[in-house]
């Protein structure tokens, strides 16, 4: 079974400017991710289980658990990208690749990336709350709180407010989805660019966003497929994520290889 060869010219000297690729590659990356998964399914599933256990333990640390979870996620993601890169070079994938982001000079830039990502998440939450408050107004928020607390509230009086609130929340939801997509565009390739190209964190976020924007068709097609796969993977008690989790990693690596590799490599290798 053939996996994408390692793109020539990749290394710690920095990533080239991203290429424009066909929109259809957004689907092809998922096909390539399956080949990456079946090349070492045991190691991939082991990484998912270990990551889930570590994330759960971090979450239950008082006060700082959630922060640590968000900050360390790019560190683990960097290790996974190194694992994908090892497979592309014909090397053996192990669960230990999950922790390679903690080694050498990789940890500091990945932690910086994690703190930036945490700031983005906090900013998104603040923006969502602010939009809700502005859309409804202080009196509207108070009225909705009263409705939740008082079963005898005047529903006739509150009906127009509830209707306007529904429209406002729909608009807010659309804005939030747009902002989340923009954030995802900046983060998509960032861990790979840090560990595989030696990009500084801010530069990695910029190049990832630029790559996504230049290839918005592929990015949107990729995202739509991801949503469908995520729904299916979540149905059997979330067990499908044992496969989809590694496929997400593999698809990110495939996207990095085609967009930041040499133009001649802009298509996945046949399986």
Per-range role (PLM):
Residues 23-54, 92-123, 160-175, 182-234, ...:
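Interfacial aromatic "cap" segments that immediately flank transmembrane helices
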Residues 135-159:
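Membrane-interface interhelical loops and short interface/amphipathic helices
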Residues 2-18, 61-96, 122-139, 161-199, ...:
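Selective recognition of hydrophobic, aromatic-rich stretches within alpha-helical transmembrane segments
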Residues 51-52, 56, 70, 74-75, ...:
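Residue-level recognition of pore/gate-forming positions within transmembrane alpha-helices
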């Amino acid at each position: 079974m053939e996996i994408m060869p390692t793109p020539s010219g990749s290394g710690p000297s920095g990533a080239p400017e991203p290429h424009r690729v066909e929109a259809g590659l957004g689907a092809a990356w998922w096909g390539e991710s399956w080949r990456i998964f079946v090349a070492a399914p045991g190691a991939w599933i082991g990484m998912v289980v270990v990551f889930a256990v570590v994330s759960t333990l971090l979450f239950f640390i008082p006060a700082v658990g959630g922060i640590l979870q968000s900050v360390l996620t790019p560190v683990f993601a960097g290790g996974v990208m190194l694992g994908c890169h090892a497979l592309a070079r014909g090397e053996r994938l192990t669960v230990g690749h999950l922790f390679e982001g903690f080694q050498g000079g990789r940890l500091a830039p990945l932690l910086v990336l994690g703190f930036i990502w945490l700031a983005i998440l906090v900013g998104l939450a603040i923006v969502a709350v602010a939009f809700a408050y502005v859309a409804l107004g202080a009196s509207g928020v108070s009225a909705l709180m009263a409705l939740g607390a008082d079963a005898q509230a005047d529903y006739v009086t509150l009906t127009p407010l509830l209707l306007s609130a529904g429209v406002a929340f729909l608009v807010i939801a659309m804005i939030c989805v747009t902002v989340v997509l923009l954030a995802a565009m900046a983060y998509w390739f960032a861990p790979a660019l840090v560990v595989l190209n030696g990009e500084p964190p801010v530069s990695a976020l910029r190049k990832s966003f630029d790559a996504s924007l230049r290839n918005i068709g592929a990015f949107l097609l990729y995202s739509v497929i991801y949503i469908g796969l995520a729904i299916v993977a979540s149905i059997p008690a979330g067990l499908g994520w044992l496969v989809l989790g590694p496929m997400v990693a593999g698809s990110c690596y495939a996207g990095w290889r085609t967009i930041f590799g040499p133009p001649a490599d802009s298509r996945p290798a046949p399986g």
